[in-house]
Structures are given as C-alpha cells and as structure tokens.
C-alpha cells in the first residue's frame, strides 16, 4: 500500500497535471508527489495566551514532517477564549467553536486528500474539536497539545486564572483589598499556555494520552519550555510512521480506550466538560458510549490527584510528579485501565507504561497511591430525577457534604444571576437555577464560571446550590449541577421551576429533584410556551437548529 494512498488522488496521473503545477508554485519537486501529504492544523492565535505559543510547535512539526520524507501542509483553525468571553454573549460561541474546528479540519483533510493530520491546539474547545475531526474522518492523526501555562504568584501564593474570577466575589464582598485585587489580576497569567489547573484544556489533553492519541508526558508540559517544542516534533515523526503503517484513529479510539480516558479524568479530578466532549468524540468515532457509562466508570475509579480547582496543585506540579503516565500506571496495576489498547505509536498502552514506576514518588503529594486516594470514587456524578430525566452532571469534589435542599432562585440569563450574587441577594441554603442556556436555548450552552466563582468568593461555595442547563468551566467547584437535560428551551422540567420551589441536589443518591407535586407540574407544563429563538441568522442560529441534547454530546451531525 503506498504511503500517499489518499493524496495520490490529487497528485497522480495526466489529469492531475494542473494540480501539480500549483504544487510546484509551493516549492514541491517531482519526487515529492510520491510522499505522503501531512496536514498541520495550526491553532496559533494571539486572541488568548492558551494559543499564543503554538506557532513554534507548528514550526517544529513542519520541520519534522519534512525530515521524515513527507510533505507538510499547514492550515489554520480558529479559537475562542473561554476565559475572556466568560460572562458575555461571546461565551455562547465557545461550544460552537468545537464544531467549527472539527468542520475546518475535516474540510481541509478531506478536501485536500491529506494522508495524515497533526492537530495543534491550546484553548478548551481546540482539543475536542480536533479529536472529533480525526474520529469523524478516520484520517491518521495525532493531537499535539499546546501546553499549560505556568502558575502566577502574588505575595507568595500561586495563582491561576480562576484566582481572578474568585477575586471578583472576594473584592465585592469586602474580603480583599484593592491592592490584592489588582495584584491577582496582573499576576494570574504570567506566560503563554492554557489555564493551569485540571480545568477543561488540561483535562482533555491529559485524557488524550490515555485515549492513545497523544504522546505520553506531552499533556502536562508547559508551553514556554523547550521540551514542548521537542514533543511536537516527535509527535509529527510518530504520525508519519502511523501513516506508513496505516494506523487510523478508529483503530485507537474504541470503547475500551474511551473508558481509559474517562478513568484518567476521574482519577485527576477533571472537568465536567469532558462528559459532553467524550459523548461527541464517541459519536464521531462510531463508538457506543452513553452518559450512564461515565457513572459506571466513576463508581470504580478513585480520585488520586490533588489538583485545582478543588485541590492544591497545577499541571506543572503534576508533570514534575510523574505526569499522566504515573497516574495511568497506578490505575493499570489496580485493574482500572485496559492495557491492551493500541496507541498512536503502534504499541499497547501497557507496553508504553512498562518503564513507569509502579508507585508515585514519596517526596510529592500531587499523585497519591490508591490506598491514600482523596476520594474513593470519581467526582463527576451523573444525577437524574424529575428535574433531569436524561441526566445532569455534578462535580462533587471539594465538598464536605454534596447534599442540599433549598428554595429555588430562578434566573433566565446569567447577568441577572451575577447581579443578584454581587448584591448579596443570594443566601446560604438557596439553589440558583439558571435556565434557557442549553445547547438550543443559549444557544451554545455557555459556561457559568463568573457566577460560581463569585459565589465562592462570597464564601458560599459549600452552602449554595447551582443548577443549569448550561455548562460549567473546568475551573468551577462547589455544589454545581450542569448539563441538565432535557433543557428548558425544549420544555424540560427546568423550564417549569418557579421562584421559591424546593429543589434537592443529592450526589450520594445521584438525585436532582424538583419537590413539586405531579399535578402542579402538569398544570405548569400545559401552560408553558416555547420562547422565540434568540438568534435567527448566523452560526448561533445554525447550531441551535442542528444540535442534539446535552445528554448526547450536543453534536450537530
């Protein structure tokens, strides 16, 4: 089988002479047409520090492809900064960017008959967008994560971007001085790289090591460090070899490898967004995987990493402690990973982990042995009940008791809720309900980091519940339940909640319940009318029309 089995459709034969003319304009030589064409999907952007350090990785990948006797074809992919758009209408474009990125990569890879694709990304939706594209096209591919940011520091305290969000609540509550507020603001993000805790970007990139689609150790490297550049080059070399072996994404992305990825997400205390994204990745790969599978894995896998947002450390600390391979070796030895899954190197996961120590080093407390796990079960619980018949996702780490029953405080938009929080109108025992923010209703299922961080900054993180059909940032912790499905816009029960209704969140019982009699709910349902769509033109309108429910990944195909 030729190495250029796809690109030969666009480069070989008399009829393709005009095509070759255009390649000659790019500097190609005649002998290049028998070599594979390797796309380099470059997410470099100066929109956000998450992506501002990607060009050097793309340059390294291009050089490595050339050195491997293949032809690099670099093209761009867009990004949205979740952190910068948070709390604004711009946040509605975040999840949509996942689909746009996937479509961009699919369009270039398929339209140009690429033989393989190196995907390079940084901010949150870059990772699932790229992986969806690779799974959907089944073109040989590898994911190169841009790397994490280094922690900031103010007065001896390590900072992340979440420090800035929480400072808003602390400052408005009078619990932080103006000097400290500005000091945190100026110092939270000192370098290029993605947000530093086990937030969404680091969650997804870490899980890609376990999935088998990224090189070991690559997900916890810091973007400014030379090893990140070296890893990008090595990733490109590995991808060219995968093309020559005809090793495709769907050979790697299987039900068992997704289970491995989810196990690592649970063990590291990762983001709720991973639930949505792995439902979408599985859909793209044609793998049967449901929201209930996350709960099945959660009940088996303990949390063994002490990482922000609910823990103490950041990704650079995890890297120094042994990285994701150390986490995986512990899980593998405990029978919690499938070691026979093939990886992008062609080796099995067990073979890749053969030289990793069986136990974490004793001189660190970032990665813990299973017998000293922070939590005996995973932290992303799937709740169901009359308020979420299809399911909802709760993040239950960092809480003394993940149970609350209290009066509903109902808001149909994020800004109204934020105003109420900052004005001290939300009290201990309340359950905030933010609705009409789901995939169709938002549209785009915006994240709620600003209000949840404000609640924590006000000192209410343990005592106020938060329920939404939108999403939460990977930086969120507290009594939070998101991804409520069915969403309000399609008439889900969350649309029927009224101010003062009693709501129960019980992570132990995996219950999300509106404590209102059935006959009253039936009366409200009969009176409910679907609101007009917020957008009727453009990408938001298209997404709202096409998207599935959150319980199926909010996919558009």
UniProtKB/Swiss-Prot annotation:
<protein>
    <recommendedName>
        <fullName>Dihydroxy-acid dehydratase</fullName>
        <ecNumber>4.2.1.9</ecNumber>
    </recommendedName>
</protein>
<feature type="binding site">
    <location>
        <position position="82"/>
    </location>
    <ligand>
        <name>Mg(2+)</name>
    </ligand>
</feature>
<keyword id="KW-0479">Metal-binding</keyword>
<feature type="binding site">
    <location>
        <position position="50"/>
    </location>
    <ligand>
        <name>[2Fe-2S] cluster</name>
    </ligand>
</feature>
<dbReference type="GO" id="GO:0051537">
    <property type="term" value="F:2 iron, 2 sulfur cluster binding"/>
</dbReference>
<comment type="function">
    <text>Functions in the biosynthesis of branched-chain amino acids. Catalyzes the dehydration of (2R,3R)-2,3-dihydroxy-3-methylpentanoate (2,3-dihydroxy-3-methylvalerate) into 2-oxo-3-methylpentanoate (2-oxo-3-methylvalerate) and of (2R)-2,3-dihydroxy-3-methylbutanoate (2,3-dihydroxyisovalerate) into 2-oxo-3-methylbutanoate (2-oxoisovalerate), the penultimate precursor to L-isoleucine and L-valine, respectively.</text>
</comment>
<dbReference type="GO" id="GO:0000287">
    <property type="term" value="F:magnesium ion binding"/>
</dbReference>
<feature type="binding site">
    <location>
        <position position="123"/>
    </location>
    <ligand>
        <name>[2Fe-2S] cluster</name>
    </ligand>
</feature>
<feature type="binding site">
    <location>
        <position position="124"/>
    </location>
    <ligand>
        <name>Mg(2+)</name>
    </ligand>
</feature>
<comment type="pathway">
    <text>Amino-acid biosynthesis; L-valine biosynthesis; L-valine from pyruvate: step 3/4.</text>
</comment>
<dbReference type="InterPro" id="IPR050165">
    <property type="entry name" value="DHAD_IlvD/Edd"/>
</dbReference>
<keyword id="KW-0001">2Fe-2S</keyword>
<dbReference type="InterPro" id="IPR042096">
    <property type="entry name" value="Dihydro-acid_dehy_C"/>
</dbReference>
<feature type="binding site" description="via carbamate group">
    <location>
        <position position="125"/>
    </location>
    <ligand>
        <name>Mg(2+)</name>
    </ligand>
</feature>
<feature type="binding site">
    <location>
        <position position="447"/>
    </location>
    <ligand>
        <name>Mg(2+)</name>
    </ligand>
</feature>
<dbReference type="GO" id="GO:0004160">
    <property type="term" value="F:dihydroxy-acid dehydratase activity"/>
</dbReference>
<comment type="subunit">
    <text>Homodimer.</text>
</comment>
<dbReference type="Pfam" id="PF24877">
    <property type="entry name" value="ILV_EDD_C"/>
</dbReference>
<keyword id="KW-0028">Amino-acid biosynthesis</keyword>
<comment type="similarity">
    <text>Belongs to the IlvD/Edd family.</text>
</comment>
<comment type="pathway">
    <text>Amino-acid biosynthesis; L-isoleucine biosynthesis; L-isoleucine from 2-oxobutanoate: step 3/4.</text>
</comment>
<dbReference type="Pfam" id="PF00920">
    <property type="entry name" value="ILVD_EDD_N"/>
</dbReference>
<keyword id="KW-0100">Branched-chain amino acid biosynthesis</keyword>
<keyword id="KW-0411">Iron-sulfur</keyword>
<keyword id="KW-0408">Iron</keyword>
<dbReference type="InterPro" id="IPR037237">
    <property type="entry name" value="IlvD/EDD_N"/>
</dbReference>
<dbReference type="InterPro" id="IPR000581">
    <property type="entry name" value="ILV_EDD_N"/>
</dbReference>
<feature type="binding site">
    <location>
        <position position="195"/>
    </location>
    <ligand>
        <name>[2Fe-2S] cluster</name>
    </ligand>
</feature>
<feature type="active site" description="Proton acceptor">
    <location>
        <position position="473"/>
    </location>
</feature>
<feature type="modified residue" description="N6-carboxylysine">
    <location>
        <position position="125"/>
    </location>
</feature>
<dbReference type="GO" id="GO:0009097">
    <property type="term" value="P:isoleucine biosynthetic process"/>
</dbReference>
<dbReference type="GO" id="GO:0009099">
    <property type="term" value="P:L-valine biosynthetic process"/>
</dbReference>
<keyword id="KW-0460">Magnesium</keyword>
<dbReference type="InterPro" id="IPR056740">
    <property type="entry name" value="ILV_EDD_C"/>
</dbReference>
<dbReference type="InterPro" id="IPR020558">
    <property type="entry name" value="DiOHA_6PGluconate_deHydtase_CS"/>
</dbReference>
<keyword id="KW-0456">Lyase</keyword>
<dbReference type="InterPro" id="IPR004404">
    <property type="entry name" value="DihydroxyA_deHydtase"/>
</dbReference>
């Amino acid at each position: 089988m030729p190495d250029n089995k796809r690109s030969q459709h666009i480069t070989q034969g008399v009829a393709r002479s005009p095509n070759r003319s255009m390649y000659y304009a790019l500097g190609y030589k005649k002998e290049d047409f028998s070599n594979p064409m390797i796309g380099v999907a470059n997410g470099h952007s100066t929109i956000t520090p998450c992506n501002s350090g990607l060009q050097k990785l793309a340059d390294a990948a291009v050089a490595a492809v050339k050195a491997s006797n293949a032809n690099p074809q670099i093209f761009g992919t867009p990004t949205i900064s979740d952190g910068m758009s948070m709390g604004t209408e711009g946040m509605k474009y975040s999840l949509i960017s996942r689909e746009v990125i996937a479509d961009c990569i699919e369009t270039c890879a398929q339209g140009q008959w690429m033989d393989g694709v190196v995907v390079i990304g940084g901010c949150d939706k870059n990772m699932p967008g790229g992986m969806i594209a690779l799974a959907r096209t089944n073109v040989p591919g590898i994911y190169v994560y841009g790397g994490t940011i280094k922690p900031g520091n103010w007065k001896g305290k390590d900072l992340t971007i979440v420090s800035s969000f929480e400072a808003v609540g602390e400052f408005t509550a009078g619990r932080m001085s103006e000097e400290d507020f500005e000091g945190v603001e100026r110092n939270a993000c000192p370098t290029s790289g993605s947000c530093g805790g086990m937030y969404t970007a680091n969650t997804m990139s870490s899980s890609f090591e376990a999935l088998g689609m990224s090189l070991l150790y690559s997900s916890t490297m810091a973007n400014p460090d030379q090893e990140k550049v070296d890893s990008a080059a090595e990733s490109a070399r590995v991808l060219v070899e995968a093309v020559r072996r005809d090793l495709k994404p769907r050979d790697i992305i299987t039900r068992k490898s997704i289970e491995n990825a989810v196990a690592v997400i649970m063990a590291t205390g990762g983001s709720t967004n991973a639930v949505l994204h792995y439902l979408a990745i599985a859909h793209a790969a044609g793998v049967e995987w449901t929201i209930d599978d996350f709960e099945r894995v959660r009940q088996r896998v303990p949390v063994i990493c002490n990482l922000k947002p609910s823990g103490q450390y950041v990704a650079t600390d995890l890297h120094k402690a042994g990285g994701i391979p150390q986490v995986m070796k512990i899980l593998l030895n405990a029978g919690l990973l499938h070691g026979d899954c093939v990886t992008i190197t062609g080796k099995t996961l067990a073979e890749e982990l053969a030289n990793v120590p069986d136990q974490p080093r004793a001189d660190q407390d970032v990665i813990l042995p299973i017998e000293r796990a922070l939590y005996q079960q995973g932290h992303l619980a799937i709740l169901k009940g009359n308020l979420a018949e299809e399911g909802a996702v709760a993040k239950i780490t960092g809480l003394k008791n993940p149970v609350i029953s209290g009066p509903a405080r109902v808001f149909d938009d994020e800004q109204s809720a934020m105003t109420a929080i900052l004005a001290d109108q939300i009290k201990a025992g309340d359950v905030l309900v933010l609705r009409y923010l789901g995939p169709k209703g938002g549209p785009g299922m915006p994240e709620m980091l600003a209000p949840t961080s404000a609640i924590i900054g006000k000192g209410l993180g343990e005592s106020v519940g938060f329920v939404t059909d939108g999403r939460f940032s990977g930086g969120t912790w507290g009594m939070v339940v998101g991804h409520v499905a069915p969403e309000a816009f399609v008439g889900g029960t969350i649309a029927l909640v009224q101010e003062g209704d009693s709501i129960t969140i019980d992570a132990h019982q995996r219950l999300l319940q509106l404590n209102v009699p059935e006959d009253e709910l039936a009366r409200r349902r009969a009176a409910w009318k679907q609101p007009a769509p917020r957008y009727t033109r453009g990408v938001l309108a298209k997404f709202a029309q096409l998207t599935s429910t959150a319980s199926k990944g909010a996919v558009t195909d």
